[in-house]
From Swiss-Prot:
One of its GO terms (cellular component) is cytoplasm. This is Cell division protein ZapB. It is found in: Cytoplasm. Non-essential, abundant cell division factor that is required for proper Z-ring formation. It is recruited early to the divisome by direct interaction with FtsZ, stimulating Z-ring assembly and thereby promoting cell division earlier in the cell cycle. Its recruitment to the Z-ring requires functional FtsA or ZipA. The gene is zapB. Keywords: Cell cycle, Cell division, Coiled coil, Cytoplasm, Septation.
């Protein structure tokens, strides 16, 4: 009887080891995914900052062109 109990215990221990091994593999996969996602977030953040700078530059250029256009229209009205 105690041999059967020992076999059952051994089977449960082996099942626990297998479960732990699978969970460790899953943890490694999730760590890799997390690293990849962090990299993507950093890239997106960098892209966002670049777009904000470009947007500001374009707004400044638009303002300069509007001022030039107003000046030209003012000269045309004078003539």
């Amino acid at each position: 009887m105690s041999f059967e109990v020992f076999e059952k215990l051994e089977a449960k221990v082996q099942q626990a080891i297998d479960t732990i091994t699978l969970l460790q593999m899953e943890i490694e996969e999730l760590k890799e995914q997390n690293g990849s996602l962090n990299h993507q977030v950093q890239q997106a953040s960098g892209n966002s900052e670049a777009l904000v700078r470009e947007n500001q530059q374009l707004k400044e250029e638009q303002h300069v062109w509007q001022e030039r256009l107003r000046a030209l229209l003012g000269k045309m009205e004078e003539v």
